[in-house]
Amino acid sequence: MANFSTNQFKAGLKIMLDGEPCNILENELVKPGKGQAFSRVKIRKLVSGKVLEKTFKSGETVEGADVMEVELAYLYADGEFWHFMNNETFEQIGAEEKALGETVKWLVEGDICTITLWNGTPITVTAANFVEIDITETDPGLKGDTAGTGGKPATLATGAVVRVPLFVQIGEKVRIDTRSGEYVSRATKAQ
């Protein structure tokens, strides 16, 4: 794999650090009044998910990580693995729960997810930024009941619980932002 110099560091770059692929979250070039310039880098280890800060001397090189990001459709979960399929080649890949993390709350069959592969093994699964999920359980919103915060908890078909407006009812499809876990709107009906 290619090597990257510290002057090529930018957010989103994937590098190898201590034998583990990492994603650069932030990069700051520091030029002290005395001495050599250095880069202060915030890194997330892709396998363990740990976030750490590391400094590199100016001009230092680091090996690039041989990771691949692919878009696959979620099929089903069998208890041990979550299965995804490439819609063009129909090749299937199973991901362990540790690769999914919080994403498991937003997986709906057929949705496209971004999967990061390292040596052919899924290490992270990211759901689309917005997903549409059915509401399976919520309290009825009573007319004129606006004394509270104007929201109520609702359980989605995936098991996740989000706050929704009072007018949303059981059986409706809602649009959720997976990055924040918040209600965005009712899902638009296909004509």
UniProtKB/Swiss-Prot annotation:
GO terms for molecular function: translation elongation factor activity. The keyword Protein biosynthesis applies. One of its GO terms (biological process) is peptide biosynthetic process. This is Elongation factor P. NCBIfam families: efp, PRK00529.1. PANTHER family: ELONGATION FACTOR P, ELONGATION FACTOR P (EF-P) FAMILY PROTEIN. Involved in peptide bond synthesis. Alleviates ribosome stalling that occurs when 3 or more consecutive Pro residues or the sequence PPG is present in a protein, possibly by augmenting the peptidyl transferase activity of the ribosome. Modification of Lys-34 is required for alleviation. It comes from the Bacteria. InterPro entries: Elong-fact-P_C, NA-bd_OB-fold, Rib_uL2_dom2, Transl_elong_fac_P/YeiP, Transl_elong_KOW-like, Transl_elong_P/YeiP_cen, Transl_elong_P/YeiP_CS, Transl_elongation_fac_P. May be beta-lysylated on the epsilon-amino group of Lys-34 by the combined action of EpmA and EpmB, and then hydroxylated on the C5 position of the same residue by EpmC (if this protein is present). Lysylation is critical for the stimulatory effect of EF-P on peptide-bond formation. The lysylation moiety may extend toward the peptidyltransferase center and stabilize the terminal 3-CCA end of the tRNA. Hydroxylation of the C5 position on Lys-34 may allow additional potential stabilizing hydrogen-bond interactions with the P-tRNA. The lineage of its organism: Bacteria, Pseudomonadati, Pseudomonadota, Gammaproteobacteria, Alteromonadales. The keyword Cytoplasm applies.
